[in-house]
Design a protein with these regions (language model features):
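Active-site-proximal alpha-helical scaffolds that flank and shape metal-associated catalytic sites
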Residues: 5, 106-159, 176-180, 203-301
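Phosphate/adenylate-binding glycine loop and adjacent helical scaffold
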Residues: 2-164
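Short beta-strand His + acidic residue motifs that chelate non-heme Fe in jelly-roll/DSBH
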Residues: 417-418, 425, 435, 440-447, ...
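A short, N-terminal "cap"/entry segment at the start of jelly-roll beta-barrel domains
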Residues: 121, 128, 132-137, 351-399, ...
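An amphipathic alpha-helical core segment
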Residues: 273-337
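A short beta-strand-loop-beta hairpin characteristic of the jelly-roll/cupin
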Residues: 401, 407-429, 439, 466-467
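Acidic, carboxylate-rich catalytic segments that either coordinate divalent cations
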Residues: 315-365
Length: 475
């Protein structure tokens, strides 16, 4: 039994067992719905039953040391969150798109007994692996102060992010990537809470005190309008390959808690945090995209925003007090722990998204950095560690991240490179680009064959160049 005073997630029971679970993960990922992507699948044709997992990565990922705050954007976090989201949504019905036999087969394969059984075995391990850090060394307060911090931090982040995208002339493309993270994943978060409510996990609270992610249709309408304005119009999960690991983690945290009745109080806290984060984003989006806001919306401006935030904080405060009164200090502490875990994840997600958008919006600078680094390699360390690849026409890499900084340098052939929906950065012989540690990207070969190198770049080299970029931005 897990007591309210313990961590929400604990990897220690799985210590020394990683090899066994990796074997199960390999079996799960070997199924047809999870095979690596083909070049035509960069954006899926509204195929809910297709989830490229890059099974080849599980040949070298060990899952021995759980995720920590500093590596939330790296490959183990990406792989574990893609796998978890696939497992959780084996319990969500999406019917075949048509009567075609191949479509029916995809539908049946996705929900197969093998997938269900393997998923049930894998999920507790991956949850502990991916989420232990969220409540580790945490002493949350037993009130709603964490929600106020989330509202403030998220509001500041979004205002600064939209301003930077405008400065870098990347607003439309940046919004496209943002809406993939927000609008495309919103149904998963709502479904997690609906599943929890149907299972009675919110029954400790009266309806008027419960957290909610679908309580204002006007927000959903604005999100859909903004998404459509930048070309994000397909159903969930058409943009699967462009989800950041931390974006999926926010969905998965809700799913993980929602399937465990003994974590019900933790779910209440995490759900209130998800509502606070969503509210801060909606208000910031309304400010940034006022031209897409309906004429009768937001008439109160700042006063209306403040009222909505105050209502959330008051409702959450009453909910925590109600839990403490009815179920005791341990239950209230677990609810606060849920807020604290989500607050920590929100901070890491802001960092992850901010770094991805900085890289994408400054890609021309990272091309220039690559040439400077290449010159330095030739002068100082020509034998630097590197990987070389020779790939055939239409060889496609499912989007992925690296655990180090790398150059991509084309020796011969042509490649298309991307890190965002709609991005096609053409690379020919002699072209190169710097890919920082943890930045999501993919590519495909468009010539008959392509030979390219990936030198691994010391962190201090990259940080010095990024500091130049930061200095220019601040002047």
């Amino acid at each position: 039994m897990t007591h309210a005073s313990s961590s929400l997630f604990d990897f220690s029971p799985f210590a020394g067992q990683s090899e066994r679970y990796v074997d199960l993960i390999k079996q799960f990922a070997a199924a047809q719905p999870f095979r690596s992507a083909e070049v035509s699948e960069l954006v899926l044709d509204d195929d809910y039953h297709r989830r490229p997992l890059r099974p080849e990565d599980f040949e070298f990922l060990k899952f021995a040391k759980p995720v920590r705050p500093h590596n939330v954007s790296r490959l183990p976090a990406l792989a574990s969150n893609r796998t978890l989201l696939s497992i959780y949504e084996l319990g969500t019905a999406r019917l075949p798109r048509n009567a075609n036999e191949a479509e029916w087969n995809r539908f049946v394969q996705f929900y197969s007994d093998d997938a269900q059984v393997l998923g049930a075995q894998i999920a507790p391990f991956l949850e502990a692996y991916a989420f232990e850090f969220l409540s580790r060394d945490q002493t949350p307060s037993a009130d709603a102060a964490g929600l106020a911090r989330i509202l403030e931090a998220e509001s500041l982040f979004w205002d600064q992010t939209f301003a930077r995208l405008m400065r870098n002339d990347y607003l439309e493309e940046g919004l496209r990537f943002i809406m993939v993270q927000r609008w495309s994943l919103a149904p998963s978060k709502q479904r997690a809470l609906a599943r929890a409510a149907a299972s009675g996990l919110f029954d400790m609270l009266p309806v008027e005190l419960r957290p909610a992610l679908d309580n204002l249709p006007a927000d959903a309408a604005l999100h859909e309008k903004v998404a459509a304005s930048c070309g994000v119009t397909r159903q969930q999960h058409a943009y699967w390959q462009f989800y950041l690991p931390t974006s999926m983690a926010k969905c998965n945290l809700l799913y993980a808690l929602a399937r465990r009745p003994d974590r019900a109080f933790g779910l209440v806290g995490a759900a209130f945090a998800a509502e606070a984060e969503a509210l801060a984003f909606s208000l910031a989006l309304e400010r940034a995209c006022a031209h897409l806001t309906s004429a009768n919306r937001g008439a109160g401006g700042a006063a209306d925003a403040q009222a909505r935030q105050a209502e959330l904080l008051e409702r959450a405060s009453h909910a925590l007090q109600s839990i403490g009164t009815a179920y005791g200090a341990s239950a209230q502490a677990m609810a606060a722990q849920g807020i604290g875990a989500a607050e920590r994840l929100c901070e890491r997600a802001r960092w992850d998204l901010g770094e991805q958008l900085l890289w994408l919006s400054s890609i021309r600078h990272y091309v220039a950095f690559a040439h400077r680094i290449s010159t330095r390699i030739d002068a100082e360390c020509p034998d630097i560690d590197r990987e070389t690849f020779i790939e055939p026409h239409e060889m496609c890499s499912t989007t992925h991240v690296h655990n180090d900084h790398r150059l991509v340098t084309i020796q011969e052939g042509e490649m298309l490179f991307w890190g965002n929906v709609g991005m096609q950065h053409k690379m020919n012989e002699g072209d190169m680009v710097l890919i920082p540690d943890g930045r999501l990207h993919g590519s495909t070969v468009v010539s008959g064959e392509c030979t390219y190198h990936q030198p691994i770049i010391p962190d201090e080299w990259v940080q010095a160049l990024v500091a130049e970029l930061d200095a220019k931005a601040s002047t």
